[in-house]
Amino acid sequence: MKKLIIFMFSIVLLGSCGKEGCNDPDAINYDSSVTKDDGTCLYSVLGNWELQTYILDGDDITSTFSDYFIYHFDDSSYSLAYLPLGDSNYIDLRGTFTLNDSHTELTYENTDVNYNDGNGWTPVIVTSTYSVNALTNETLNMSLISTDVPNVSSVELIMSKI
């Protein structure tokens, strides 16, 4: 009888443990059978993102832009458009991006720039890799790991999905 009670108690304890995983339906690894979120949710970087904070080499330069948007497309291409404050021409960049499987590093390879000055697209190859500090369905927060851009040692970006 004592063994039966212990056995039944064990079943109740084990049965009450919920399945852990990602229970956010907005995540790309959502599992509807999960009852306890374990912090492993992964979110898509695809879509339109708007700049909230841009810190370059320790200086907050967010206010130097009237607009700053990046569009991540499902073919791993991106388009970045920004309008410097007081300017009338957007500067457009395009290229490809790679987000690693664990969503911890995001690499951009710029292929072209257009200053919208009548000269069209000009080839420019620049590679920048960022550490993804946070990626949710609403926020992308990243810090520069490496770049080909001379004289740039640190970048912190916070973007909001629009």
Question: Could you describe each region identified by the protein language model?
Answer:
Residues 4-8, 14-50, 57, 63, ...:
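Primarily marks secretory-pathway-exposed extracellular/lumenal segments that are disulfide-
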Residues 70-78:
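Conserved beta-hairpin
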Residues 56-60, 77-141:
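Contiguous, well-ordered beta-strand patches that form the walls/edges
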Residues 67-71, 128-130:
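Signature of short aromatic-glycine-proline-rich micro-motifs recurring in repeat-based ectodomains
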